Amino acid sequence: MPVYCKSQCGNRAVLRRPKTGDALCKECFFAAFEAEIHHTISSNQLFQPGQKIAVAASGGKDSTVLAHVLKLLNEKHNYGLDLVLLSIDEGISGYRDDSLETVKQNRDDYQMSLKILSYEELYGWTMDRIVAQIGRSNNCTFCGVFRRQALDRGAKLLQVDSIATGHNADDIAETVLMNILRGDTARLRRCTDIRTGGGEDSIPRVKPLKYSYEKDIVMYAHYKKLVYFSTECVFAPNAYRGHARAFLKDLEKVRPSVIMDIIYSGEQLRFKDTVKKPVRGTCSRCGFVSSQQPCKACVLLEGLNRGLPKLGIGKKSKGDRMIAEQNRELDLRERANLVKNDF
C-alpha cells in the first residue's frame, strides 16, 4: 500500500524526514526545510535589508546548502542582502584543493562573487607543513584557530556586515558535549548562541542552520542535486570532535530527539557569578578580536616560526606565558626610556 505525503498534497511520499519522522514528497520536504530556516532567520533577526553577508564556503554539504537556501530565501522573501562567498584555503593537499573546485562551481551556479584566502598568504604556513612539523596530534587546534581568524580577516577585507556559517544542529550538540567533557565553561556559555561576536572591533557570525539536522541537510542536497564535496579532511580522524560525534550518534539511536535536547539544555545552562567570563578585546599584535593577549593565533604562529610548535598548546601554554613575559619586559623598557627621556 503506497504511503502518501503527510501534508495532504495528494502526492506519494518519497522520504521520511529524519528530524520529524514525517513521510513527505520531495516538494513538501523542500518547502518545510526552507520554511524552517526562514523562521530561524526572521525570528532571530539575523539579517537586515541592505547588508552584505559573507557565506563561509568550504564546498561541503552544509555551506553548499546554506548558500543555495540563502540565495533562494533572499529572492523569495526580499531580504535585500548582498551575498558573497568567502573561502579559506588551509593548504591540505588532496582535500582543500579539490573542495575549492566545488566552491568555484557554487560561485558559478549561484552567481555570487568569491574571495579565497590562504594560510600561506596570511601566515606563511600551510597545514601540510604544520602537520609535517608537529605530527598528527593537535593539528586541528592550529587549523581551527587560524581558520577562525582567517574568516575575520576575509570578512574585514570584503567589508561585510556579518558572516553566515554552516554550523548545523549536530555540530552545535557535539560542541556542547565537547565543552562539557573538557570543562570549558567559557566556550560552553556561547557555543549555542545563534549570533556571536559583533561590537566595534569584530564582525558578527550567524548560524542560519542552527536547528537543521545534518541528515535533513544531506537529504536536501541529494534531492536538489546540489554539487558538493563529500570527502572528509585527511586529518579529521584524529580530531577530539570525532569522539563527541560518535557518542552523539549512539545516543541518537536510543533517543532520536537527543540533538535538540542537548541544544536546548545548553541554552538553559546558568553559571555562577563567580565563574570568570573571558573579556573580548583586540590583540596587541595583529589587531584582531581576542580574549587573551596576544591572541591564540599569534601565540601558535610564534611557536611555529621559532621551531617550537607545541609552545601554544594547552589552556595556558608555555608559549602564552613566554610571550606575556616578553611583553612585560618590553613594557618595562618603554617605561624606563620614558623616565630617562624626562630628565
Swiss-Prot record:
InterPro entries assigned: CTU1-like_ATP-bd, CTU1_C, Ncs6/Tuc1/Ctu1, Rossmann-like_a/b/a_fold, TilS/TtcA_N, tRNA_thiolation_TtcA_Ctu1, TtuA-like_LIM_N, UPF0021_CS
Enzyme kind, highest EC tier: transferase
GO biological process: protein urmylation; tRNA thio-modification; tRNA wobble position uridine thiolation; tRNA wobble uridine modification
Keywords: Cytoplasm, RNA-binding, Transferase, tRNA processing, tRNA-binding
Pfam families cross-referenced by the UniProt entry: ATP_bind_3 (PF01171), TtuA_LIM_N (PF22082), zn-ribbon_14 (PF16503)
Pathway: tRNA modification; 5-methoxycarbonylmethyl-2-thiouridine-tRNA biosynthesis
Record's subcellular location: Cytoplasm
GO CC annotation: cytosol; cytosolic tRNA wobble base thiouridylase complex; mitochondrion
NCBIfam families the UniProt entry points to: TIGR00269 family protein (TIGR00269)
Family: Belongs to the TtcA family. CTU1/NCS6/ATPBD3 subfamily.
HAMAP family cross-referenced by the UniProt entry: CTU1
Name the record gives this protein: Cytoplasmic tRNA 2-thiolation protein 1
